[in-house]
Amino acid sequence: MALPSLLLVVAALAGGVRPPGARNLTLAVVLPEHNLSYAWAWPRVGPAVALAVEALGRALPVDLRFVSSELDGACSEYLAPLRAVDLKLYHDPDLLLGPGCVYPAASVARFASHWRLPLLTAGAVASGFAAKNEHYRTLVRTGPSAPKLGEFVVTLHGHFNWTARAALLYLDARTDDRPHYFTIEGVFEALQGSNLSVQHQVYAREPGGPEQATHFIRANGRIVYICGPLEMLHEILLQAQRENLTNGDYVFFYLDVFGESLRAGPTRATGRPWQDNRTQEQAQALREAFQTVLVITYREPPNPEYQEFQNRLLIRAREDFGVELAPSLMNLIAGCFYDGILLYAQVLNETIQEGGTREDGLRIVEKMQGRRYHGVTGLVVMDKNNDRETDFVLWAMGDLDSGDFQPAAHYSGAEKQIWWTGRPIPWVKGAPPLDNPPCAFDLDDPSCDKTPLSTLAIVALGTGVTFIMFGVSSFLIFRKLMLEKELASMLWRIRWEELQFGNSDRYHKGAGSRLTLSLRGSSYGSLMTAHGKYQIFANTGHFKGNVVAIKHVNKKRIELTRQVLFELKHMRDVQFNHLTRFIGACIDPPNICIVTEYCPRGSLQDILENDSINLDWMFRYSLINDLVKGMAFLHNSIISSHGSLKSSNCVVDSRFVLKITDYGLASFRSTAEPDDSHALYAKKLWTAPELLSGNPLPTTGMQKADVYSFAIILQEIALRSGPFYLEGLDLSPKEIVQKVRNGQRPYFRPSIDRTQLNEELVLLMERCWAQDPTERPDFGQIKGFIRRFNKEGGTSILDNLLLRMEQYANNLEKLVEERTQAYLEEKRKAEALLYQILPHSVAEQLKRGETVQAEAFDSVTIYFSDIVGFTALSAESTPMQVVTLLNDLYTCFDAIIDNFDVYKVETIGDAYMVVSGLPGRNGQRHAPEIARMALALLDAVSSFRIRHRPHDQLRLRIGVHTGPVCAGVVGLKMPRYCLFGDTVNTASRMESNGQALKIHVSSTTKDALDELGCFQLELRGDVEMKGKGKMRTYWLLGEQKGPPGLL
């Protein structure tokens, strides 16, 4: 055979860097060269090997050594070990690929184990290889195997409660590799290991063979497994039809792992294994008989990477090998070889990085055990025996009209669980047959005696049956009457007058503390706003002393048809811990509303969007578990489905139990938003693609749509980034909904951070939001799935509640501490602002809740000043320029007066009023404090510059007077500390009669300053003061630096 020219390389080694002095990696292949009936034939596998090597890069050259294990077109257990010995002797390979046939693989595996050389194959399905003893310790099976098929069959028996017996029929032609024998061997050993009575027989391909087969079936089991060519199955089923074994008492499992019977052929169409080139009568008989047949095949990987790989495989096979391959399950074996080479490269890389060598084959093989990684064939999971976990599909006649076979269930080998597609199996009698019905096999049982009954026994039996029928009829009539009475009583009805509304604080006070996860001080529960991002709150009220949630219905009236009455009755009948309790409904126009149990902790969406709440994974799993329990109960109830599941429809009660709300009562539902509103699309972020298309769905379809909504909520809980979080994308809800509705590959789904999340949780999300509803699990399966990877979920209800309460207490303690710090900071700011408005001593009295009494002061000194020409300056400036000027000036003044024992009373326009000697008395210091402050302000004005008129000089006019005053706080709103008395008026007159850039002081102030003897004053003379007559006044010129007086 002319092999394609390949340079095989392994890039995974040492992170893409070839070790110094390393030799080429040698890959030896022992596979059939010509016989394409084998899925592991070299023309099928060779292109996959080439693709795998190309995918790995060019860090280390690989020598490819291929030899055929065929002898006259068949697998040879004699030739294969000789080829392997030659390869070892002349080429010393690092890895052996193949053989796929069982007997050659056994021989070669013994040599490989002795050489400590890894042997990788995607064939060799026999159960004998599962025990990796000293003979097969280096054998790695990266493809399907018979023991994994047996595990699937045992799981099927457990599902259908078949625990007694089974019968196996198979064809065993020793001229080839005995594929049927080794395939059904896995089923035999698995069922026998489950303590079932399992009988087997080789099918005789000779006249009388079908009769022998049906005789064997009658004597040994109702659950029959058949493994052989499709023609053999046809012969057995035709005979079974003639003997009435297809009446529903038997089920026939056809083990066709590569699904060849479901592919189109010369005489049959795709999915119709019953079609054959027979008479019309026989064809009809086969079609009827095939209703009792279930076909088991490998599962074709659903991931797009495998589809791309298969396309490339077919192209390479045609170009490099001159072979035309068709898309089929046989190509799965090539994909398994591909993933096996990647696995070997990954483990070899790790071994070298840890200091090992490629020659340490046992160490490399041991490191492959228990591996999980994503390959082109999907999730690859290796068990402890280095056998890959295998997925299977169970096919049934899904459409009785056309006779087409469709998937009824998928089996995940990694999870050991069956996922039902929702398509019912067409059992002839409406239910699975019994595997060990009474008197079918154990004829020695005395209860199986069929002696005719006596006349007396017949009369007694008839009388008993009559009484039973009478009793049942009476019960049904009574039940019907009670139902009509209950419908007529309308126990659910609530009058609008019975609902009480009032102050929300009173409701919250009566309902207990509301310093909880939800907001305080509101009688509302959560609902989505028009923008879909923030929460408003649903109305609450009182009904019979209890706080209830009230949802108004946007309808003018409700017609009480029989259907509506049944809906309301069903809502009252449904009671479960994880569903909000339906209390009643008000149908009094215009106040039509639904009244339900109120959950004070808010909605799940509120909790997830509140960053101050710390949710560890124990708490999150608890919320998820509550949601799954509630949905499982709802799906099994008379209501059957939710239809609008979202995180805002999941609420949390005071005991931190999640409950589902807004279910049922389809007649009350209405859409208030316009068809193109933002809020409408925001609510559809949880809606399944099949619902977005607008097509009506059956009940099972609605349940699968709920599963999709659950997946979006699961993503919300896992990431806490809002519904349908998309990393790096900023799309509106409308754009997201349109992309989901389009259903184009790759399907549009939320972002998942696989590095941060549990792999099994991610897998559950992806299954729940699968595009095909039949691929989604039901909530019963989801419950079991979560129970397995949530190890902490097995604690008791009390322990779980205590853990929730402890976590909430810790979170609340942290929240209170943060709020306390925030309060103290705001208190400090408020006090600072208060001290700027009022004197410190006055502010302290107000803080203590005391009334500030007016107080008389015998002697204080008051300062007044204004700007000469300010009116003209204002007229020539804009209002903003005037404000800027005064702000700059008074900021300067305020900074200066902080250095003196004075109190700033007020500023009015350009007027500035300051006092010393109150509210804290300072003896005789008030006059010199004001004097020094006035001198400082006058000096500051000389260097002050106006921004918009930098060349102009401000002219400050100052007046000072000393005398008695009365002071106190005036007003309740915006209180002010005001001064009263003639001294205030006199000080104002001193300022208004003064001159620019001079300090005008009264004689009383001059007397107070003279006591110090350090201030320079100049007599101005007698000045006529309005309302005062003539007063002798002085100019304050400065202060002499010398020995202090009083100060």
UniProtKB/Swiss-Prot annotation:
Domain Guanylate cyclase: 861-991
Signal peptide start and end residues: 1-16
Key words of the record: Cell membrane, cGMP biosynthesis, Disulfide bond, Glycoprotein, GTP-binding, Lyase, Membrane, Nucleotide-binding, Osteogenesis, Phosphoprotein, Receptor, Signal, Transmembrane, Transmembrane helix
Gene disruption phenotype: Mice mainly display dwarfism associated with impairment of endochondral ossification, reduced growth of longitudinal vertebra and limb-bone. Self-clasping and priapism that could be due to neuronal disorder are detected. The development of the female reproductive organ is affected.
Pfam family, one: ANF_receptor
Topological region Extracellular: 17-458
Protein purpose: Receptor for the C-type natriuretic peptide NPPC/CNP hormone. Has guanylate cyclase activity upon binding of its ligand. May play a role in the regulation of skeletal growth.
Protein name: Atrial natriuretic peptide receptor 2
Record organism: Mus musculus
Origin organism lineage: Eukaryota, Metazoa, Chordata, Craniata, Vertebrata
